[in-house]
């Protein structure tokens, strides 16, 4: 009995030692909260937002060595309808990272620099369109408005503080339309799109992919594309400086996750848009117009000197139109985390930074596409083959998810059903805007029509050629 008692006492002592060690280990473990604000209804944020979130790419790259050995990371994502609320939450120290468009980025940096001690850093991009496509102004599909000059005396809504808001201000400035000559309404993307569908607003300006959502659903029609401003359309990542100072390796990990997200989309755009539709609710056919080969967005985290120039120009637009604090771009923008991330991935940052994609050049000669509901996407090297295929599919009663053509002026990928077709002796050309189509038709003695008209002309030509 004595021996048994001694053994029990020894076991109790050992248990107490292990318990104390476990408590001490738990007490030494630090939990670092990583709070990210993103926008699941803004396509140009996806490589730093929904894709990173759903594929858990940040967790893949988070540091685990050195001072991070005993750290537990708690990653949280908050979804917002535009960039402005993200900045507000960052200022309240409820978010460390923010993903937003060019004008909201500028407001973010300027607001933080206007404080005594708080700062953010612009550490990476997500994607771009060189000429500015992504933002657009849309009217109800039955509207008789076809140009921005027709917006004088009209009511125009936009999410104030968004990238589209900045685009709208710039577009009005460029067309000599003063703020007193139109009514500006602050409406969220969802409200603006609903009002366009109901014909309750004359026009609505919004960021990607809302104009294409309205086009795809048959409720809206573009009258102005952001590419007409000829200013790059950008999104990027800002981080609170106090977080960066304490956990710089986390920012590097975030950039590496952004890079992999871009690779994942490029590897298989159809797979990507199918999953992103499930994650966001945005139709895959709409997402395809952004993320496919020849799509509106070039996924690229690098910060090019041209982007800095564009952001400075955008800041000037806001200074002219609205009261906005100064912004020291040299203090705000840093490539340090990008360079460290690229080095860790074995990539050449300077080489990728030097690459610039212009859709007007790179999209020349790309094939037209038909997305069949069962057979997937087929490509066509000529407009005649494309139109014939559409007619043949329809004759079988097949459901076509979407068709895609390219704007002759900008190289932008368009929905076939919303493009303006011009029929000439040399065949068909397609345009985003009716004024461009009218001008081309005037030069070439052509006729402007929609897809249905083009199909009729194509069928007549085929019958004649078969005689």
Regions found by a protein language model. Give the residues of each.
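A bilobed periplasmic-binding-protein/Venus flytrap-type ligand-binding module shared by bacterial periplasmic
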Residues: 52, 134-145, 233-249, 422-424
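Secondary-structure end/capping motifs
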Residues: 43, 245-324
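Conserved C-terminal helix/tail region of periplasmic/extracytoplasmic solute-binding proteins
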Residues: 318-356
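Bacterial N-terminal signal peptides that target proteins for export
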Residues: 3-17
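Intrinsically disordered, low-complexity linkers and terminal regions
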Residues: 236, 346-379, 383-467
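Sec/Tat signal peptide C-region and signal peptidase I cleavage site
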Residues: 6-7, 25-29
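Pocket-lining segment of extracytoplasmic ligand-binding domains
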Residues: 113, 181-185, 189-278, 384, ...
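Short, glycine-/small- and polar/acidic-enriched structural segments
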Residues: 30-178, 183-185, 202, 231
């Amino acid at each position: 009995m004595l021996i048994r008692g001694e053994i029990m006492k020894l076991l109790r002592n050992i248990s107490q030692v292990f318990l104390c060690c476990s408590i001490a280990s738990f007490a030494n473990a630090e939990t670092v909260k990583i709070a990210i604000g993103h926008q699941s209804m803004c396509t140009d944020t996806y490589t730093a937002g929904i894709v990173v979130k759903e594929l858990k790419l940040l967790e893949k790259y988070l540091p685990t060595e050195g001072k991070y050995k005993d750290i537990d990371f708690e990653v949280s994502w908050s979804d917002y309808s535009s960039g402005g609320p993200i900045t507000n939450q960052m200022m309240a120290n409820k978010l460390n990272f923010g993903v937003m468009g060019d004008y909201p980025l500028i407001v973010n940096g300027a607001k933080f620099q206007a404080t005594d001690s708080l700062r953010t850093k612009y550490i990476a991009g997500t994607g771009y369109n060189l000429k500015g496509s992504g933002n657009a102004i849309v009217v109800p599909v039955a509207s008789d408005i076809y140009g921005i000059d027709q917006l004088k005396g009209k009511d125009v809504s936009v999410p104030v503080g968004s990238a589209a808001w900045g685009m709208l201000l710039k577009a009005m400035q460029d067309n000599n339309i003063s703020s007193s000559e139109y009514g500006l309404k602050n409406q969220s993307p969802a409200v603006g799109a609903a009002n366009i569908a109901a014909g309750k607003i004359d026009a609505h300006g919004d960021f990607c992919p809302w104009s294409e959502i309205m086009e795809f659903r048959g409720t809206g029609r573009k009258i102005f594309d952001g590419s007409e401003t000829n200013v790059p359309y950008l999104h990027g990542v800002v981080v609170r400086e106090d977080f960066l100072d304490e956990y710089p390796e986390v920012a590097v990990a975030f950039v590496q996750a952004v890079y992999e997200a871009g690779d994942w989309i490029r590897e298989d755009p159809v797979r990507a848009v199918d999953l992103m539709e499930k994650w966001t609710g945005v139709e895959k056919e709409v997402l395809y117009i952004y993320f496919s080969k020849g799509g509106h967005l070039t996924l690229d985290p690098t910060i090019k000197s041209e982007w800095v120039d564009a952001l400075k120009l955008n800041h000037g637009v806001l200074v002219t139109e609205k009261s906005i604090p100064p912004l020291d771009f040299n203090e705000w923008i840093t490539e340090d985390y990008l360079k460290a991330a690229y080095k860790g991935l074995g990539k050449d940052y300077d080489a990728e930074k030097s690459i610039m994609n212009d859709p007007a050049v790179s999209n020349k000669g790309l094939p037209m596409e038909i997305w069949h509901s069962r057979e997937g996407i087929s490509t066509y090297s000529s407009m005649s083959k494309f139109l014939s295929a559409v007619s043949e599919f329809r004759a079988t009663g097949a459901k076509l998810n979407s068709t895609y053509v390219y704007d002759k002026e900008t190289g932008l990928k368009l929905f076939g059903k919303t493009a303006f077709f011009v029929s000439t002796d040399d065949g068909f050309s397609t345009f985003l805007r009716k004024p461009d189509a009218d001008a081309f038709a005037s030069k070439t003695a052509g006729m402007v029509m929609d897809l249905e008209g083009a199909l009729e002309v194509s069928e007549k030509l085929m019958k004649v050629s078969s005689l």
